[in-house]
Amino acid sequence: MYNEKIVEILQNPKNVGIIKGANAVGKACSDVCSDILKFYLMIDDGVVIEAKFKTFGGSALIAVASVTTSLLIGRTVDEILAFDTNEIIQVLGNLPNKKGYCLGLVEQALRSAVEDYYKKLEKEQQE
């Protein structure tokens, strides 16, 4: 069902966990199967310096989230907003049928994280 690359990532997913003090946290929930994806980002001077994830979801979502966090390091906030999920497919290969929703969750969770970042930044500037 899963290709070799996905199986390899599932055997040792990267960046699983929570970043204490993350200044950008984004969450997305699937209407299709109730999967939940949460990204924790540490952004310094507008650039992602650390990224982790937690999920209540299946194997495909774990692999997609793991690859995404690796791809985010070194990107600017604007680059996160413009993130193309085809980059994930380039790393993983094609996802099995009915797993494409995982890419949509990534997009939603990243937008949510950027919104959270800007809210926290605005609050910080007002203090």
Where are the predicted features?
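Domain-level signature for proteins that mediate thiol-based redox and metal-cofactor handling
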Residues: 1-127
